């Protein structure tokens, strides 16, 4: 109302109101709400505890005091007596319980214990991680039925002496060569230092008369021709690589010898490759 009157301009005197009281002999129709008395009012004894009057006598009369030092124990004084300062003595070692005593003498032993616990934990975590990784890797390996199909059994009595027979193994050509005595002596007499990929003949065979190779040229993956080439072994028609009867590179662009797969003689005339 006052703000409206202040902004009304020339109508402000009309909008303002004045109240006056005139004394008279007539008695009031209503009694006074608070009778006049000379006795002091009685305060309610059940007043709220958390009020300004109740807290004024319990508040701290002095500021909070804290004492901290290098050779003295830390202490804090509060206004309330029911507050318990946390005590971590049960978690501390006996050598460092006394704050007024130097703990330098026991520092090496405490460090050694910490290092021992850390190293033990690290080894345990590494072992657990190794097992987890091993199980994960083994889950991606081939199953037993797939591994069974990856092996091939060859009857050696079907291959005459001096001949080479090709088989299909894991989608690749597999050469099994029955060498003659002349071929065995010839390949054993080759000087290893003259070879591009130095390897003695006895390192590539388990039985001198049998040579088992993967028929894939190590240059660009072509299939060599058996009993051909300048050295009577294998010849790659793609780029002219020559291999001897032991599958070693002797001439041409191929950088390595023919690969020797994993095989095992189960009997005198049966070999299992894979």
Swiss-Prot record:
The protein's required cofactors: [2Fe-2S] cluster
Entry's Gene Ontology molecular function annotations: 2 iron, 2 sulfur cluster binding; metal ion binding; oxidoreductase activity; protein-containing complex binding; ubiquinol-cytochrome-c reductase activity
Transmembrane segments: 104-140
EC identifiers of the protein: 7.1.1.8
Domain of life assignment: Eukaryota
Keyword Protein biosynthesis attributed: no
Post-translational modification, as annotated: Proteolytic processing is necessary for the correct insertion of UQCRFS1 in the complex III dimer. Several fragments are generated during UQCRFS1 insertion, most probably due to the endogenous matrix-processing peptidase (MPP) activity of the 2 core protein subunits UQCRC1/QCR1 and UQCRC2/QCR2, which are homologous to the 2 mitochondrial-processing peptidase (MPP) subunits beta-MPP and alpha-MPP respectively. The action of the protease is also necessary for the clearance of the UQCRFS1 fragments.
Catalysed reactions listed for this entry: a quinol + 2 Fe(III)-[cytochrome c](out) = a quinone + 2 Fe(II)-[cytochrome c](out) + 2 H(+)(out)
Keyword Ligase: no
Top EC class for this record: translocase
A GO biological process held by the record: mitochondrial electron transport, ubiquinol to cytochrome c
PANTHER family, alphabetized: CYTOCHROME B-C1 COMPLEX SUBUNIT RIESKE, MITOCHONDRIAL (PTHR10134)
Protein name per its UniProtKB record: Cytochrome b-c1 complex subunit Rieske, mitochondrial
Organism name: Rattus norvegicus
């Amino acid at each position: 109302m006052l703000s409206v009157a202040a902004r009304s301009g020339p109508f402000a005197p009309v909008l303002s109101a004045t109240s006056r009281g005139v004394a008279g002999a007539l008695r009031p129709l209503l009694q006074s709400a608070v009778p006049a008395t000379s006795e002091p009012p009685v305060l309610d004894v059940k007043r709220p505890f958390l009020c300004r009057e109740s807290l004024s006598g319990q508040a701290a009369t002095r500021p909070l005091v804290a004492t901290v030092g290098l050779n003295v124990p830390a202490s804090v004084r509060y206004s309330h007596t029911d507050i318990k300062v946390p005590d971590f003595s049960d978690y501390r070692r006996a050598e460092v319980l006394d704050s007024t005593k130097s703990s330098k003498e026991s520092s090496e032993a405490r460090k050694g214990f910490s290092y021992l616990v850390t190293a033990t934990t690290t080894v345990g975590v590494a072992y657990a991680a190794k097992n987890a990784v091993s199980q994960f890797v083994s889950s991606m390996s081939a199953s037993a039925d797939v591994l069974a199909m990856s092996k091939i059994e060859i009857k050696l009595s079907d291959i005459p002496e001096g001949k080479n027979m090709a088989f299909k193994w894991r989608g690749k050509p597999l050469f099994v060569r029955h060498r003659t005595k002349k071929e065995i002596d010839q390949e054993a007499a080759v000087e290893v230092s003259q070879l591009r990929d130095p390897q003695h003949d006895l390192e590539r065979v388990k039985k001198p008369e049998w040579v088992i190779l993967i028929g894939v040229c190590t240059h660009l993956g072509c299939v060599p021709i058996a009993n051909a080439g300048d050295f009577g072994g294998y010849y790659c028609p793609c780029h002219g690589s020559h291999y001897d009867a032991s599958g070693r590179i002797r001439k041409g662009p191929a950088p390595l010898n023919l690969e020797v797969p994993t095989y095992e003689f189960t009997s005198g005339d049966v070999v299992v490759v894979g």
